[in-house]
């Protein structure tokens, strides 16, 4: 990744990562804004919003997209440097806030009401708001309209559909069974949850991985494997290839998968995930968020930029035109984007989902649930034993 700076183009090397406040990246200073955003996001569109801000206020805005910015930010912010504003998925922000690297943000009620309420929950840490929500990502059911014009509304219908499709040499559904991010929506549907969230805080001792609902969801998944409706070794690339070649009728994936499906010319739709036992599947929801560096001398300018320039229809449109944001937190712009049924479905699934907890204990959750699903799918452990082990690993 190359980063444009005032002194030409410097490739970030091992050396410059050691001295990150070297000329490779703009230093924090009063009277200008430096923003970091990942290279896969619409940074040129964000720079356009910055130009408008500069025209109106005279304050220069520099947008940078350093490699591994989520790792660099805590290193430089701890020394009182880095960007004024950082964009990243909300689940990393809890750790930053715990280390005192993010300023509390204080949007008034009128501004908060412009955004979907659940998106604010994603940027709350210990009861305080630590960032502004920008865009929303969640898994959806993606289906091949030529194979299933009317996709099933329930998980319980899928085995029979698979039987019908097998006669034609196809299968009903394939999705990544190796990562709990993809299997969790079914496990959580009937009452499983990661950590209990109450009063703006997560209770790390209240974990819902081996309750009756989680067991029911995982048992259904394992039964589908035992009955050969799915294969235990299916991973992301196997599932993606099968769907994009028209070999399977449905998959579970997010907005990042759409461009490859577009290229494959499959006639597809995006819709609500199926219900299980009459209850919605609960995907983890990721929220692209913008936090303000606690060391920034420009906190009021950062707030002005985020509230009155970026989080407006015009601001988000500029970023979205550069690289699609998917569903967005701002109600007025989401209403425009929702004319695309894929984006409407993403938001529907997100609103039924579970905000990805922004606490460090999630790394133990991912590891433990991944092991549990793989062990249960391969027959190494029963569902009950696998989830019991996962629960104790997460809470120990």
From Swiss-Prot:
Signal found in the keyword field: yes
InterPro entries, alphabetized: Maltose/Cyclodextrin-bd (IPR006060), SBP (IPR006059), SBP_1_CS (IPR006061)
Subcellular location, principal: periplasm
Compartments in which it is found: Periplasm
GO MF: carbohydrate transmembrane transporter activity; maltose binding
Entry keyword Nucleotide-binding: no
Span of the signal peptide: 1-26
GO BP annotation list: maltodextrin transmembrane transport; maltose transport
Keywords: Periplasm, Signal, Sugar transport, Transport
Annotated GO CC locations: ATP-binding cassette (ABC) transporter complex, substrate-binding subunit-containing; outer membrane-bounded periplasmic space
Superkingdom of the organism of origin: Bacteria
Pfam families: SBP_bac_1
Subunit composition and interactions: The complex is composed of two ATP-binding proteins (MalK), two transmembrane proteins (MalG and MalF) and a solute-binding protein (MalE).
Function: Part of the ABC transporter complex MalEFGK involved in maltose/maltodextrin import. Binds maltose and higher maltodextrins.
Family the UniProt entry places it in: Belongs to the bacterial solute-binding protein 1 family.
Name this protein carries in UniProt: Maltose/maltodextrin-binding periplasmic protein
Organism (species): Salmonella typhimurium (strain LT2 / SGSC1412 / ATCC 700720)
Originating gene: malE
